[in-house]
A protein has these predicted regions:
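Transmembrane helix-loop junctions and nearby membrane-interface residues
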Residues: 9-19, 94-101, 152, 190-197, ...
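Transmembrane helix-loop boundary segments of multi-pass membrane transporters
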Residues: 129-130, 191-238, 253-268, 314-315
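Helix-loop-helix connectors at the membrane interface of multi-pass transporters/channels
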Residues: 1-4, 68-72, 79-85, 142-180, ...
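A generic transmembrane alpha-helix motif of multi-pass inner-membrane proteins
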Residues: 235-315
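TM-loop-TM module centered on a large, flexible mid-protein loop between adjacent transmembrane helices
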Residues: 35, 80-144, 162-207
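Lipid-exposed faces of alpha-helical membrane segments in multi-pass integral membrane proteins
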Residues: 3-10, 85-92, 129-136, 177, ...
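Membrane-interface helix-boundary motifs at transmembrane edges
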Residues: 69-73, 197, 227-234, 279-288
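Helix-loop-helix junctions that connect adjacent transmembrane segments
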Residues: 1-131
Length: 315
């Protein structure tokens, strides 16, 4: 699937026109005029945060499968290589495209926009090539996310933090129950797309918002761990922890209050599962648990009321 992407990048480099790029990227044409009104830059950055997060969701996938790795060092290496590769590809595709087609035309291209860009440069066969690559990419993503979604509840169940039912394996070592439940949920989502064109946009916005809180608390834990081991902490650990925490808080803010409320609705089943697991482990809920339970329930009720009243428009 990388062949069409690399071909698009090479073709855009050849066809790149700096005047076209300057007009779209800086909002200026050759005479220094401002043909477009891009509005407030910070508002634009904020509005694209969920889409940006959605692009990089799953970059931690190597960590999920770390228990199956022969060398633990490969997990960190794979994560860094994956992050840099995805970042570089998206950067080149986004920036170079603005040097080929003017910005307001790019914003009106249908999905997949990369196919239209290549067709603009080399002809209709370019669009066909990109679409073939897209099919291969979707099949690969389908396989990868099927494994990732099934592995996560399986590992958590083995650690005693999820119902033991999810830890069941077949004769080949595959987490059958975890794969069954996660794929049923995927099918329900796919069916929902038949009834509204906005289902995918709503789903990736909600999923991006939901993943922000695990990311944020992971960053907080890095700071907490560094403080607890400050005698051996390095400047690198402090820098990563603090910057990641600040960025995570900004992401939660950028996602908006409405998606925070809707995310709380997703956590309600988690409260039930958590209570069952604690009971099975013969562990009593703590005061902190009850405080978080109360906050999540209150916010979810507010979100449900706003959703039913139309105050939150998801489609």
């Amino acid at each position: 699937k990388l062949i069409p992407i690399l071909l698009v990048i090479i073709c855009m480099l050849v066809a790149f026109n700096f005047e076209t790029f300057k007009e779209g990227f800086f909002g200026m044409n050759a005479h220094g005029a401002l043909p477009f009104n891009f509005g407030d830059t910070m508002s634009q950055v904020k509005s694209t945060m969920l889409v940006t997060v959605w692009v990089f969701i799953g970059i931690e996938g190597a960590v999920v499968f770390s228990s199956r790795a022969k060398r633990k060092k490969d997990v960190g290496t794979a994560t860094v290589i994956g992050l840099i590769s995805v970042l570089l590809i998206y950067f080149l595709l986004t920036v170079l495209a603005q040097g080929v087609i003017i910005q307001n035309h790019i914003s009106q291209l249908n999905t997949p926009s990369m196919a239209h860009v290549l067709a603009y440069i080399v002809g209709d066969w370019g669009s066909t090539l990109v679409n073939i690559g897209l099919i291969i990419s979707v099949l690969g993503a389908w396989l990868g996310w099927t494994l990732l979604a099934g592995e996560l509840p399986f590992i958590v169940a083995k650690d005693g933090l999820f119902p033991k039912w999810f830890a069941k394996e077949n004769e080949n070592g595959a987490p059958v129950n975890a794969l069954l439940i996660t794929n049923i949920l995927v099918q329900i989502f796919l069916i929902s797309m038949l009834f509204t064109d906005s289902a995918y946009q709503f789903a990736f916005s909600l999923a991006s918002s939901a993943i922000l809180y695990p990311y944020m608390f992971s960053a907080f834990y890095q700071v907490k761990y560094t403080i607890e081991h400050k005698q051996h902490a390095t400047p690198k650990q402090w820098t990563i922890g603090i910057l990641a925490s600040l960025y995570a808080v900004w992401l939660v803010y950028a996602a908006g209050f409405d998606y925070l409320l809707l995310t709380m609705l997703l956590y309600i089943p988690g409260l039930i599962v958590y209570s069952i697991v604690q009971k099975n482990n013969q562990t009593r809920l703590t005061r902190i648990d009850y405080i978080f339970f109360t906050i999540i329930i209150i916010l979810s009720i507010v979100g449900l009321i706003r959703l039913c009243s139309g105050a939150i428009n998801v489609f």
